């Protein structure tokens, strides 16, 4: 993904003789990085292991540049709640793998917001819950983007350059005002 973005902005030449694909994973589930047992389905091979198996079987030249970006939710409380409500409370939304993933040549950790502005979070503080189109003030954007990025940097040692909107949603404010003002 980072290579494609650098190419689109003219910072890098892209090899375009073949179609390009970007692998991204949202929310930061442990399945992005490791193989786990999932209730009712047994052992589920992690995405990283699938990529490693591909490289081992076909060689790096079969898919040069194979790489994935895991967009993670920063807030431990939000991850615990999502894990409890959606993943059988098995602890599958931890951050104990982020640093190792960031150091791995096949994966990068990026920003998917502080808490996803997830509707299941009972306490929204001063902000409306339910989606990302309601993130409409500088303060709310800053909390969702910068606070998350700083937390991720503290875990991985690298400030995440990329942000993926939760639910694929965004307000006009975050798209047209907040992010453009953050560019240097």
Predicted segments, located by residue:
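His/Asp/Glu-enriched short active-site or ligand-binding loop at hydrolase and phosphoryl-transfer sites
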Residues: 1, 159-160, 169-184
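A short acidic (Asp/Glu
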Residues: 34, 80-83, 121-122, 172-178
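Alpha-helical scaffold elements lining the catalytic groove of polysaccharide deacetylases
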Residues: 36, 93, 99-104, 114-156
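Active-site environment of divalent metal-dependent phosphoester hydrolases
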Residues: 31, 116-118, 167-172
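Sec-exported extracytoplasmic/periplasmic mature domains
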Residues: 30, 52, 56, 146, ...
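Charged, glycine/proline-rich intrinsically disordered loops and linkers
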Residues: 37-44, 127-132, 175-184
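Active-site beta->alpha N-cap acidic-glycine motif
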Residues: 1-106, 159, 165
